[in-house]
């Protein structure tokens, strides 16, 4: 009703951008006639106009027209009008919802260029290193062509490289790298070690994945703490001996376990202790973690065991996350369960959530194919509006209604049969599964039916081939099984991705000749042997024996055709030229990848080697496209890509992402979900009602049912889960907001010290406040002066400032409390000047160095302890909800007290340390006769 009266709010939003779109299109003819040099000169002209008082909004139409023209020349891609709209939405600091295949990556070039003109830096953020690298290489060409510098942050980079890349106009990187660099910068001990500039503007690709899916996971930098390994092993034995229902209950929804009274008795009996909560010998924490590890953390679902280590699997992307560990002893409990080496527990040194990290930017924007379902959360927490950008071509995807089976076994058989039917007609199929284990169940069923397929999951032997598999997933009769759709970012193009194949072919010849062998190459990961031609995507044990040598050989079936003799001889010639210029096996892998990336770009280059490689790349591309375009038409005729979902995800948004793989850019396609009553979503959130229906209808195991009631039950279950998780994220945000204010205060203080701002004045201020604290501790203004404890006051002052050893109680006996404070402040200033001249006799700037050292040392040490205290406080206030108190209000007020105590301790410790500081002269090295 309201929509009819007021009109669609989304359309109203888009309407206000329309005049700018018209203006950009009118400017197109003007910029088309400019030479490359003149187009590049526009960048300096825009910067000059900004200096002279014009705003970014004033420049928007012209800058967008210039970027569009540069993109046409360099990439051969012209921004559609809807992409211009997307760019304006991003420039306004909003979220642009754009469907898969609508060119989100190209859209980001528009606001990135415009905002980079200020010189304050722009961050383009993606979810993994591979995508960051791809975008920096691919879209970076446009920016480089226009004279802007482009940086890239990768996990393996040194601090010097990071600093150089952050100093660029536009920097591509992942959310986690940006976050960890922010934390590391705030732990550095000199300003030279700081790599980031102040956070200005950022565009996040897959913004829902970063700001919502990852919002519950804080980024943590930690140090190691010794803990007894035996406790984890004993607790694991206890967990195995205890029985569910009888000794403990599992709350899957809250991912928690609760011991029953019998459970407590049994656990205490096995361990031979009288109380699990005994503060002298606490066991409860270990036992709870061991039961969680047994019941809630499943091998091949939540983690995999690789090289005798527990490696976490990201529940949203299905990717492994090496190096990440669960905190609070949980990781150790899982190590004990799997009988691998138990590593030391860690102590948090610095932490931040993505929610608060991205709110540090002056302006934030993002793009995704699916944001509308989470619009309320984006607006409430991040103050980000969501605007839907219309598609360039109408959507032809057909979403077939879900089918539900009674048992999981029947569901998997039905999925395998559906794959067989589609394979028969030659349609490509993408099957989304929710765990490594389930993808392998389906793989076995397909092998029994002799259906060749590719497996894409967190297993190491499949990860290496991720983008290669996705790039081919749209070819005729291809069957791809993907866990949680890892590989987001590589488009599934019907008929196959010719550009990617041409790059693979050139790499296959070039890389073995110019890349250093593995043991000389510190940056490369452990490599995986690729399967031989004709295999089903299983690479044996995924390891090569002997010395780790990377294999660049690609399975021949990846390519649509063998390259012509001419192309092959040109390719060998180009590779020889590269070897001649760079040397045989002499480049680190990252550098070689850069060379390969530039060779497959269109940006102008004077390098003869790159020109040769580019010439042969384009020739191979042409040969491949002749095949892929025919195959594209064939696949379109047969109905396009068919996407099969095998379980509804907790969130409708993730389901929509999987569906969005089919029917990109107006192509045909279809999607269907196959479900069972044993699926987690139905089991945990509302399966009883559905099971009741099934039993009432006496449905056979293998008989599918499709019904409106079922579909609405599922939708309701998903809404319940979404609300549940939103509440958790909101709570995380509200609690972290308290920490965030403290973090900002402490990091701002730290940065001022690092930059060496007024160090002496700061320490004198600390010393004066410490004198005030001492007076307030020993002088009670409500008592008569003769009862004031002046002897102790003087002793305490001397304890802090030994240079005031001549101070007597009689010197202050006749003073009022404010006069006493003034007197001691003056004394401490004189003492500090005396201390400074003593220290500086040894080296003129030594006192400033000492000030910086002691302040940073105390801030870091006490902040670490403070983080632990705040964690303990958060757990403690959680219990107060039972006593009718609001835990959040309690946490805020007590957290503030704890913070003030820490700030006081920092001041006092710094003053004490500096007055105690007595530098020693280094003895001169004696001359050897």
Swiss-Prot record:
GO terms for biological process: intracellular protein transmembrane transport; protein import; protein targeting; protein transport by the Sec complex. Keywords: ATP-binding, Cell inner membrane, Cell membrane, Cytoplasm, Membrane, Nucleotide-binding, Protein transport, Thylakoid, Translocase, Translocation, Transport. It comes from the Bacteria. It is a peripheral membrane protein. Pfam families: P-loop_SecA (PF21090), SecA_DEAD (PF07517), SecA_PP_bind (PF01043), SecA_SW (PF07516). SMART domains: SecA_DEAD (SM00957), SecA_PP_bind (SM00958). Signal peptide: none annotated. Its EC number is 7.4.2.8. It is found in: Cell inner membrane; Cellular thylakoid membrane; Cytoplasm. It catalyses: ATP + H2O + cellular proteinSide 1 = ADP + phosphate + cellular proteinSide 2. One of its GO terms (molecular function) is protein-exporting ATPase activity. CDD domains: DEXDc_SecA, SF2_C_secA. One of its GO terms (cellular component) is plasma membrane-derived thylakoid membrane. Transmembrane segments: none annotated. ATP binds at residues 83, 101-105, 491. Its main location: membrane. Monomer and homodimer. Part of the essential Sec protein translocation apparatus which comprises SecA, SecYEG and auxiliary proteins SecDF. Other proteins may also be involved. Part of the Sec protein translocase complex. Interacts with the SecYEG preprotein conducting channel. Has a central role in coupling the hydrolysis of ATP to the transfer of proteins into and across the cell membrane, serving as an ATP-driven molecular motor driving the stepwise translocation of polypeptide chains across the membrane. Belongs to the SecA family. This is Protein translocase subunit SecA.
């Amino acid at each position: 009703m309201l929509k009819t009266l007021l009109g669609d709010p989304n359309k109203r939003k888009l309407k206000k951008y329309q005049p700018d779109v018209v203006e950009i299109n009118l400017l197109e003819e003007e910029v088309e006639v400019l030479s490359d040099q003149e187009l590049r000169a526009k960048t300096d002209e825009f910067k000059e106009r900004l200096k002279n008082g014009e705003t970014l909004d004033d420049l928007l139409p012209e800058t967008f027209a210039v970027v569009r023209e540069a993109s046409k020349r360099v990439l051969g891609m012209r921004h559609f009008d809807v992409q211009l709209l997307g760019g304006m939405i991003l420039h306004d600091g909003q979220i642009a919802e754009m469907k898969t295949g609508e060119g989100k990556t190209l859209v980001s070039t528009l606001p990135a260029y415009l905002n980079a003109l200020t010189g304050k830096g722009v961050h383009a953020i993606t979810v993994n290193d591979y995508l960051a690298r791809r975008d920096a290489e691919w879209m970076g060409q446009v920016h480089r062509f226009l004279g802007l510098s482009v940086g890239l942050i990768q996990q393996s980079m040194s601090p010097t490289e990071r600093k150089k890349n952050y100093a660029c106009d536009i920097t591509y990187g992942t959310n986690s790298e940006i976050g960890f660099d922010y934390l590391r910068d705030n732990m550095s001990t000199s300003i030279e070690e700081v790599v980031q500039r102040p956070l200005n503007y950022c565009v996040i690709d897959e913004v829902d994945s970063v700001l919502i899916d990852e919002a519950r996971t804080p980024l943590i930098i930690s140090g190691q703490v010794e803990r007894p390994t035996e406790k984890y092993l004993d607790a694991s034995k206890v967990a195995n001996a205890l029985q569910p229902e009888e000794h403990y209950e599992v709350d899957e929804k809250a991912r928690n376990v609760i011991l029953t009274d019998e459970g407590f008795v049994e656990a205490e009996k096995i361990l031979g202790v009288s109380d699990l909560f005994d503060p002298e010998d606490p066991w409860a924490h270990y036992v709870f973690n061991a039961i969680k590890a047994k019941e809630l953390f499943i091998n091949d679902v939540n983690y995999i065991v690789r090289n005798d280590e527990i490696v976490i699997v990201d529940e949203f992307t299905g990717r492994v996350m090496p190096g990440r560990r669960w905190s609070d002893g949980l990781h150790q409990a899982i190590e004990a369960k799997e009988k691998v080496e138990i590593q030391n527990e860690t102590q948090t040194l610095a932490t931040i959530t993505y929610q608060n990290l991205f709110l540090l930017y002056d302006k934030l924007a993002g793009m995704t194919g699916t944001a509308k379902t989470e619009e309320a959360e984006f607006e409430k927490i991040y103050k980000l509006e969501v605007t839907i950008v219309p598609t360039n071509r109408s959507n032809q995807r057909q979403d077939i209604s879900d089918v539900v089976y009674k048992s999981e076994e029947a569901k998997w058989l039905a999925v395998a049969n559906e794959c067989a039917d589609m394979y028969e007609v030659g349609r490509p199929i993408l099957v989304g599964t929710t765990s490594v284990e389930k993808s392998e169940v389906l793989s076995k069923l397909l092998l029994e039916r002799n259906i060749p397929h590719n497996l894409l999951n967190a297993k190491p032997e499949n990860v290496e081939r991720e983008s290669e598999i996705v790039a081919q997933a749209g070819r005729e009769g291809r069957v791809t099984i993907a866990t949680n759709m890892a590989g987001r970012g590589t488009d599934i193009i019907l008929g196959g991705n010719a550009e990617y194949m041409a790059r693979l072919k050139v790499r296959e010849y070039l890389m073995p000749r110019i890349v250093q062998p593995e043991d000389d190459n510190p940056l490369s990961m452990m490599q995986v042997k690729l399967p031989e031609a004709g295999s089903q995507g299983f690479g044996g044990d995924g390891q090569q024996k002997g010395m780790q040598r990377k294999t660049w050989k690609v399975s021949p079936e990846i390519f649509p055709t063998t390259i012509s003799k001419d192309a092959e001889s040109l390719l060998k010639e180009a590779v020889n030229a590269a070897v001649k210029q760079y040397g045989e096996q002499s480049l680190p892998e990252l550098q070689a990848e850069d060379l390969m990336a530039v060779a497959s770009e269109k940006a102008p280059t004077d390098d003869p080697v790159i020109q040769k490689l580019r010439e042969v790349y384009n020739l191979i591309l042409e040969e491949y496209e002749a095949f892929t375009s025919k195959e594209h038409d064939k696949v379109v005729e047969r109905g396009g890509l068919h996407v099969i979902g095998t379980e509804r995800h907790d969130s409708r948004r993730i389901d929509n992402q999987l569906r969005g793989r089919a029917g990109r850019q107006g192509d045909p396609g279809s999607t269907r979900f196959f479900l069972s009553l044993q699926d987690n979503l139905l089991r945990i959130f509302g399966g009883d009602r559905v099971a009741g229906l099934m039993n009432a209808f006496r449905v056979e195991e293998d008989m599918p049912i499709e019904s409106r009631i079922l579909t609405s039950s599922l939708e309701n279950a998903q809404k319940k889960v979404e609300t549940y998780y939103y509440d958790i994220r909101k709570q995380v945000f509200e609690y972290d907001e308290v920490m965030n204010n403290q973090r900002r205060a402490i990091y701002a203080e730290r940065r001022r010290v690092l930059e060496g701002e007024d160090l002496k004045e700061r320490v004198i201020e600390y010393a004066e406040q410490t004198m005030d604290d001492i007076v307030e501790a020993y002088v009670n203004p409500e008592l008569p002066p003769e009862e004031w404890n002046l002897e102790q006051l003087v002793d305490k002052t001397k304890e802090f400032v030994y240079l005031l050893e001549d101070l007597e109680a009689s010197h202050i006996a006749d003073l009022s409390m404010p006069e006493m404070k003034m007197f001691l402040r003056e004394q401490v200033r004189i003492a500090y000047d005396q201390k400074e001249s003593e220290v500086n006799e040894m080296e003129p700037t030594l006192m400033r160095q000492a000030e910086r050292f002691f302040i940073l040392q105390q801030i870091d040490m006490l902040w670490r302890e403070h983080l632990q205290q705040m964690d303990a406080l958060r757990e403690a206030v959680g219990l107060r909800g039972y006593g009718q108190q609001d835990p959040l209000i309690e946490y805020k007020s007590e957290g503030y007290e704890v913070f003030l105590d820490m700030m006081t301790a920092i001041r006092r410790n710094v003053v004490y340390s500096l007055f105690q500081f007595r530098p020693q002269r280094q003895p001169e090295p004696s001359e050897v006769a």
